[in-house]
Regions:
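Small-residue-enriched hydrophobic alpha-helices in membranes
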Residues: 1-28, 32-155
């Protein structure tokens, strides 16, 4: 992952773990994480490993290899209380801000945008009713990932 060579292995791990954490954040916002939400989040991760932005394909390949294990670990070890879980995930994701600043501005923008579109895609799946995408009210406050500072597209 040549775009991440300025980062430590711990920082790269935090960036990678953000994907299953975002999936748990969105899927669990209503207090119930369904198998279909977990499966869809895993499928999204896999799709992004071969389709999408070229500079993030290798990143998603790394995540795809262990996504289900990480997702299940987070569900198992994070608090079962929804508010406590959401806060813990939010606090964890806020640690990405310092790491994203170390990246090339375009890569940071792509990664930030990718996190947000991933969150939206997970929400669409969890609220899919008769083929219509519906974002549940509990998910709405988390969709823009307010704990991660906005990154503008470089000029």
């Amino acid at each position: 992952m040549t775009h991440f060579e300025t980062l430590t292995s711990d920082e790269i791990q935090l960036l990678e773990e953000a994907i299953p954490l975002i999936a748990v954040l969105i899927a669990g916002a209503d207090g119930h994480i369904q198998i279909s939400e977990s499966d869809w989040a895993a499928k999204l991760t896999h799709i992004r490993s071969y389709s999408g932005l070229e500079d993030l394909k290798e990143f998603y390949k790394q995540i795809d290899a262990n996504f289900k294990i990480k997702f299940e670990e987070f569900v198992k070890f994070l608090p079962t209380d929804t508010d406590a879980r959401q806060k813990m995930i939010s606090d964890n994701l806020s640690n990405l801000n310092k790491i994203l600043q170390k990246l090339d501005p375009l890569v940071a923008f792509h990664l930030y945008t990718s996190y947000k579109t991933y969150a939206k895609s997970v929400a669409d799946a969890s609220g899919n009713i008769l083929g219509f995408h519906y974002v549940q009210n509990e998910e709405k406050p988390w969709l823009d990932l307010p704990m991660i500072h906005s990154i503008a597209e470089p000029v």
